[in-house]
C-alpha cells in the first residue's frame, strides 16, 4: 500500500463518461476508499504525479491518453510500476483483452459491468498488494 492511511486506500478512477465515473466513485467511496477522479488520460497521470494511488481504475478509451497508454507509462516508471491497474472497457474482442494485459493491467472488466463485482475485484487486488 502507498503512503496513504492504511484504513483508507486511495483509488484513482479515470473515465471520460461522467455517469460511469460517478457510479464507480460512489460505490468505492461507500466501501470506504478515498477517491480521486480524472476525466481524461492526461489528468489521470497528473493526479498520479501529485499523489500515488493504491490502485487505478482506468477506462480504455479516453481523450488524450488511453487506459492502455496510461498503464504502459505507469509500468515504465520505477515509482509507479507497482500500482495495480484495472481496465474498464466496452471493447470485448480477445485482441482488446490481450492488449490490456500486455500493457500491464492487473485486471480487465468489460462494460456493462456490475459495480459490486468491481468493488470485489478492487478489494481482492488490494488484499494481495
Where do the model's predicted regions map?
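Receiver (REC) domain active-site loop signature in two-component systems and cognate sites
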Residues: 62
Amino acid at each position: 500500500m502507498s503512503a496513504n492511511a492504511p484504513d483508507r486506500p486511495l483509488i484513482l478512477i479515470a473515465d471520460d463518461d461522467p455517469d460511469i465515473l460517478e457510479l464507480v466513485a460512489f460505490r468505492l467511496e461507500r466501501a470506504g476508499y478515498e477517491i480521486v477522479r480524472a476525466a481524461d488520460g492526461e489528468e489521470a497521470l497528473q493526479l498520479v504525479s501529485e499523489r500515488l494511488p493504491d490502485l487505478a481504475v482506468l477506462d480504455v478509451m479516453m481523450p488524450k491518453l488511453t487506459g492502455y497508454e496510461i498503464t504502459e507509462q505507469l509500468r515504465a516508471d520505477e515509482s509507479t510500476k507497482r500500482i495495480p491497474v484495472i481496465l474498464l472497457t466496452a471493447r470485448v474482442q480477445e485482441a482488446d483483452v490481450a492488449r490490456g494485459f500486455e500493457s500491464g493491467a492487473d485486471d480487465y472488466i468489460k462494460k456493462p459491468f456490475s459495480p459490486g463485482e468491481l468493488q470485489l475485484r478492487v478489494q481482492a487486488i488490494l488484499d494481495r498488494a
